[in-house]
Curated annotation (Swiss-Prot):
Ranges annotated as biased composition (Basic residues): 132-146
Protein name per UniProt: Probable xyloglucan galactosyltransferase GT11
Its membrane topology: Single-pass type II membrane protein
Entry EC number(s): 2.4.1.-
GO biological process, one term: protein glycosylation
Tissue specificity remark: Expressed in roots, hypocotyls, cotyledons, leaves, stems and sepals.
Spans within the Lumenal topological domain: 35-720
Keyword Transferase in record: yes
Organism lineage: Eukaryota, Viridiplantae, Streptophyta, Embryophyta, Tracheophyta
Native source organism of the sequence: Arabidopsis thaliana
Keyword Amino-acid biosynthesis: no
Length: 720
């Protein structure tokens, strides 16, 4: 009985709880539906089509006087029926305007303000766009550029340009302009109108006026700079000699005070040939680096350091990260013939090696006014390697064009218009001479850019028909750090026993009709006991192992060096390093290339056999070499061994005091650059109109013999 009462009691309580929960749910449902309806009404009021045809008198009159009426803005393009909106037109605004209508009017006011601001921004952007377009002239936009990383440099350049433009507003320039022809008078009626414009608009109009009427002169500069170079600042070059143009005239009419112009003029003198400092600043008479100082540009990292950081992108088939390690020397190799300092060096890493050697150069200066030459630490070969086999030629040119723009805007460039600058490329010159009319051809256009043609370019192979390209030795496997290592290796080469008369390491070139490699390999096979042949056929790994290659050269008295895909071979320097006398078949393989590093008397260190005689079967290589007297062979070998230091690159960490009296290929190349720049400087100071007084196709002849008279080698260098 007690249990039944207890059960009935709990049942009654349960129903109470259930009923209360149900009532609470109904209340919440009602509140939710009411809130949703309110939100829906507000959303409908905020729709654009529901706020368009509102009467003007219901909008608070708190706009600025110069703003346009709201009804003109919102009713131009859209017409929507707003009859369903709860708006009362006849009721007084202060008494009958609903809360929703106030929200709508506030929104309309906000939209109107936003429209006015956008209109002002649009007008400003159009004016600025026209001004920038006028400054660019007719230059076509570049398809690919690395502008993001050069943004800081661009801002600096704009400030420099502004200073240089203001410099031309000095009183002296005013007087010079008064003597100019009357082609400026066409703009006199425009000047009073410009005086009425505010300062900002005056600056914009001045920029437009100083560039747009100057199309003819800017076209000349752009044509000289290969059309797709950015040459809007080409007038700052050292060669500027044309009369002043409309650009300077308009600037002289602005409201800048003459006193300010005089101060700026003294601080930034215009770059004219007569006033430019061609010679470096004098130092003390007993300065050991006098005339040898070199300044190294601090170019943006994307032109060198970032290429090494992203080394995995340089080649699809080769691990360039490994090959660019150890200052560009590559992986360390075991000692050879008891001498240390051997590395698996790739022939295309010369740029990295040279850069690291320059960091240790004894006459490197941070003061560009002392420098006799300026080094540009750009890695053009590695940069090109990334896109060499790609389908987009413009990507091969992008970084080079950006660098040229950066150089043109530097103060060091303006001193001699870049003629005291030099750069190193670890590839042959043919990789950098793609012509504009053949965009799909191999390589890029670096060597034909106007700026580079003013510079001195160091490559592992130069063109015989080029003013500014000079060849330097290929990197070898030996990079000693001390004087003792050099002497030890030379002594080892003098004592070594050489079993074979001559040897050849290479592959045939059946696709090249004028190649003599097949004939050479046939003659070597015929001289079984006197010739050693290492045929680099497909799949053979011996030709890629430094120790195997050096063993071949160490066992031979003469090493054959016929041309391959190009005139030169890295094998030439590997064989000389091994004390093997080189045998050349074309003067372009060494004699007309490495004019700074090899002796003028070619018979002292090499043998020359005309390739035509080999091709036609008129000569036996074995007979020619066997007839050389033994005493002469010893003398030639001694000369080759003495050449070894000049044809290799010391370890970049080595100091000049560590290597003693020896000069390596780097030292010889820098001396050659300094001598060439000094010659150009003298010709400029003498007022020579032409820097070179001989045709460019005879460059090889002038560099080798000092004249362009007829020579027996002329048939070898007939232009193709």
């Amino acid at each position: 009985m007690a249990m039944e009462k207890s059960s009935s009691k709990y049942r009654t309580q349960f129903w109470y709880v259930a009923m209360a929960s149900f009532l609470l749910w109904l209340v919440l449902l009602y509140l939710f539906s009411s809130s949703a309806k309110t939100v829906h009404n507000h959303e409908r009021l905020f729709r654009q089509e529901n706020i368009i045809d509102l009467p003007v008198e219901n909008v608070p009159q708190n706009h600025e006087p110069d703003e346009a009426p709201v009804v003109n803005v919102v009713s131009e393009d859209i017409s929507v029926d707003n009859s369903s909106l709860p708006v009362s037109v006849d009721s007084p605004p202060d008494d009958q305007m609903s809360e929703d209508k106030k929200v709508v009017t506030d929104l309309v006011e906000e939209l109107e303000k936003e429209r006015v601001e956008n209109e002002k921004k649009r007008v400003d952007s159009v004016v600025i766009g026209r001004s920038s377009k006028a400054r660019r002239g007719h230059r076509e936009p570049r398809k690919a550029r690395s502008s993001g990383r050069l943004e800081a440099e661009k801002k600096r350049v704009r400030r420099n340009d502004a200073d240089e433009s203001n410099a031309e507003n000095s009183d002296e320039n005013h007087q010079a302009l008064d003597k100019e022809p009357n082609f400026f008078e066409a703009k006199k009626d425009v000047e009073p109108k410009k005086a009425l414009v505010d300062d900002n608009d005056d600056d914009l109009e001045t920029k437009r006026g100083k560039e747009l009427p100057n199309d003819s002169s800017s076209n000349v500069v752009e044509d000289d700079n290969d059309d797709d170079l950015e040459t809007k600042k080409g007038k700052d070059n050292i060669s500027k000699s044309e009369p002043k143009t409309q650009r300077n005239f308009v600037l002289n009419k602005n409201n800048t005070s003459k006193a300010k112009n005089r101060v700026i003029s003294k601080r930034n003198q215009p770059s004219r040939v007569g006033k430019v400092m061609l010679r470096p600043r004098e130092t003390r008479s007993n300065d050991p680096c006098k005339g040898k100082y070199v300044y190294m540009h601090e170019v943006p990292a994307l032109f060198n350091e970032e290429l090494l950081k992203n080394c995995w992108t340089l080649s699809r088939w080769t691990d360039m990260c490994e090959l660019t390690s150890n200052f560009g020397l590559g992986p360390r190799l075991p000692n050879m013939e008891g001498v240390s300092g051997w590395y698996a060096t790739n022939q295309f890493t010369l740029e990295v090696i040279f850069h690291n050697r320059m960091k240790q150069y004894k006459c490197l200066t941070k003061d560009s006014s002392l420098a006799s030459a300026v080094y540009v630490p750009y890695y053009p070969g590695l940069d090109l390697m990334r896109f060499l086999w790609g389908p987009f030629p413009f990507m091969r040119d992008a970084a080079a064009l950006d660098l040229m723009k950066w150089l043109r805007e530097s103060q060091e460039w303006k001193r001699m218009d870049g003629r005291d600058h030099f750069m190193v490329a670890g590839r042959t010159t043919w990789d950098f001479m793609r012509t504009p009319e053949n965009e799909s051809d191999w390589g890029n256009r670096l060597m034909i850019l106007p700026e580079v043609r003013n510079m001195t370019m160091l490559l592992i192979e130069s063109s015989p028909w080029n003013y500014h390209g000079f060849a330097v030795p290929y990197p070898t496997y030996f990079h000693p750090s001390t004087y003792a290592e050099i002497i030890q290796w030379q002594m080892r080469m003098r004592r070594i026993n050489r079993r074979y008369l001559f040897s050849f390491v290479g592959a045939p070139r059946p696709n090249l009709g004028d190649s003599i490699r097949t004939e050479i390999m046939d003659q070597c096979k015929a001289s079984k006991r006197k010739c050693k042949l290492l045929e680099c056929i497909s799949g053979s790994q011996k030709c890629y192992k430094p120790d195997q290659i050096m063993k071949f050269f160490l066992s031979s008295t003469f090493c054959l060096q016929p041309p391959g895909d190009s005139y030169t071979r890295r094998s030439t320097f590997d064989s000389i390093l091994a004390g093997c006398i080189p045998v050349f078949f074309h003067p372009g393989s060494a004699y007309a290339q490495y004019i700074w590093h090899l002796p003028k008397d070619i018979a002292k260190y090499s043998v020359f056999i005309p390739e035509k005689n080999v091709k036609e079967g008129k000569v036996s290589i074995e007979n020619v070499l066997s007839r050389i007297p033994r005493t002469k062979v010893f003398a030639m070998r001694e000369q080759v061994i003495r050449l070894i230091p000049r044809l290799m690159y010391f370890h970049p960490s080595s100091k000049s005091e560590d290597t003693g009296r020896f000069e390596d290929a780097f030292d010889v190349a820098v001396e050659g650059v300094l001598e060439r720049v000094e010659g150009l400087r003298k010709r400029i100071e003498e007022g020579k109109e032409e820097i070179f007084d001989f045709p460019e196709q005879y460059s090889w002849k002038y560099n080798v013999f000092g004249n362009v008279e007829r020579h027996e080698w002329d048939p070898y260098f007939d232009r193709p």
